[in-house]
């Protein structure tokens, strides 16, 4: 399975640097000088290989210079490129409570009493923390967002394909978060 570890947001300066939106917990390893990156544009099958020539942080953003990208024009052509790895390249964690996003996607979600709720469709990362995006069983659209915290997500078994949640009252209500006047 292909996993995205970064995306080219835009070019930076005139010497061919690119700004990378990091989507990995290990940017210092994945984007180190000398690292070989595989990348492609969204919805394109052709995968290109790039070698990192220089890497630095600037104003909280990762800037890379890649071999064969000498100027702004070449860097602009990379805008939107997704840097990917194969999930088989990932080292399994020794921590039983640590998961890669792709391991959770597709798992069945049940309530503590065993009631089937739906399935994890995505793990969302926000400034406030991680959220499980859940598609309710029998529904084709819409999502339920559940904070991925120990107080609510009581157990995860990748081997059994199950996430068990014990949500606080009201979290699963369709109108949760709306005021009495519907706003």
Curated annotation (Swiss-Prot):
Keyword Translocase: no
Assembly with partners or alone: Binds ribosomal protein uS19.
Function as written in the Swiss-Prot or TrEMBL entry: An accessory protein needed during the final step in the assembly of 30S ribosomal subunit, possibly for assembly of the head region. Essential for efficient processing of 16S rRNA. May be needed both before and after RbfA during the maturation of 16S rRNA. It has affinity for free ribosomal 30S subunits but not for 70S ribosomes.
Subcellular location: Cytoplasm
Record-linked NCBIfam families: 16S_RimM
Principal localisation: cytoplasm
Family from the record: Belongs to the RimM family.
One term of GO molecular function: ribosome binding
Any one GO cellular component localisation term in the record: ribosome
Keywords recorded for this protein, A-Z: Chaperone, Cytoplasm, Ribosome biogenesis, rRNA processing
Chain ranges of the PRC barrel domain: 95-171
Entry domain remark: The PRC barrel domain binds ribosomal protein uS19.
Signal peptide: none
Species whose genome carries this gene: Rhodococcus opacus (strain B4)
GO biological process, alphabetically ordered: ribosomal small subunit biogenesis; rRNA processing
Record has Nucleotide-binding as a keyword: no
Pfam families, per database record: PRC_RimM (PF24986), RimM (PF01782)
Official protein name in the record: Ribosome maturation factor RimM
Gene that produces this protein: rimM
């Amino acid at each position: 399975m292909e996993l995205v570890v970064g995306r080219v947001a835009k070019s930076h300066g005139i010497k061919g640097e690119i700004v990378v939106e990091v989507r990995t917990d290990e940017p210092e390893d994945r984007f180190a000088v000398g690292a070989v990156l595989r990348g492609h544009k969204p919805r394109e099958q052709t995968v290109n290989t790039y070698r990192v020539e220089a890497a630095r942080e600037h104003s909280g953003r990762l800037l890379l210079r890649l071999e064969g990208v000498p100027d702004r024009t070449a860097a602009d052509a990379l805008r939107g490129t997704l840097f990917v790895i194969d999930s088989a390249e990932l080292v399994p964690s020794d921590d039983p409570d640590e998961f890669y996003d792709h391991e959770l996607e597709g798992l069945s979600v049940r309530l503590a009493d065993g009631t089937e709720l739906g399935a994890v469709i995505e793990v969302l990362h926000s400034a406030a923390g991680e959220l499980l995006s859940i598609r309710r069983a029998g529904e084709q659209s819409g999502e339920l967002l559940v904070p991925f915290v120990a107080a609510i997500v009581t157990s995860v078994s990748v081997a059994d394909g199950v996430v068990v949640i014990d949500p606080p009252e009201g979290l699963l209500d369709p109108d949760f978060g709306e005021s009495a006047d519907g706003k």
